[in-house]
Amino acid sequence: MGAPLAAALGALHYLALFLQLGGATRPAGHAPWDNHVSGHALFTETPHDMTARTGEDVEMACSFRGSGSPSYSLEIQWWYLRSHRDWTDKQTWASNQLKASQQEDSGKDATKISVVKVVGSNISHKLRLSRVKPTDEGTYECRVIDFSDGGRGVPRVLCLLIPLPAPPRAPRPRGQPPGEEPGRGPTLLFLIILPGTGSGTPREAEPHQPHAGGCPARQS
């Protein structure tokens, strides 16, 4: 009875954290975000919440339709932010994240892990993360640069990865081969989406070593 109760309490703890983060990032009295960013621009595909066990492969999809006509260049950037602790600080998000400057507001703990650029009005890019592990914990961000507006606005979707601790190891049943061990605990991907503005310098980036998620978004 002790192990199942501990696992249930752990799951409730992370569910409470997810609800707290969702409440902190949505102003009171405001309707949920929609997919539209500005004009006809919108996200046509965003990452979904998902669960995965340690060692599994996961992927997060991000698709965007630009507002430019005729076609202009679009760019998708995937970023990895090593820490998610500031997510619980509502004032931090309101003052820092939603008022991004014209420069890349990457921060010292952010790493650009993937870049795709196309000439056209639609772009799509899936971030594939192999053999997820607890050290993959952090925030994954999909930024879109729409050059039809001069690259002034950068709509974004943010995905928070929270690995759950592994459950207590159960005794090996009689007759089970010594090499077999119980599986690791699940990894939860919670999705939180915020609007934002900013700009990025297009360039290729080396993939991030940790291998890592629909909610709507709009640009303020």
From Swiss-Prot:
One of its GO terms (biological process) is negative regulation of neuron apoptotic process. InterPro entries: Ig-like_dom, Ig-like_dom_sf, Ig-like_fold, Ig_sub, Ig_V-set, IgSF_V-set/TM_domain. The keyword Glycoprotein does not apply. Residues 41-158 form the Ig-like domain. Pfam families: V-set. Keywords: Disulfide bond, Immunoglobulin domain, Signal. The keyword Transmembrane does not apply. Disulfide bonds join 62-142. Residues 165-220 are annotated as: Disordered. Residues 1-24 form the signal peptide. GO terms for cellular component: cytoplasm; extracellular region. Residues 165-180 have a biased composition (Pro residues). PANTHER family: V-SET AND TRANSMEMBRANE DOMAIN-CONTAINING PROTEIN (PTHR12207), V-SET AND TRANSMEMBRANE DOMAIN-CONTAINING PROTEIN 2-LIKE PROTEIN (PTHR12207:SF31). This is V-set and transmembrane domain-containing protein 2-like protein. It comes from Mus musculus (Mouse). The lineage of its organism: Eukaryota, Metazoa, Chordata, Craniata, Vertebrata.
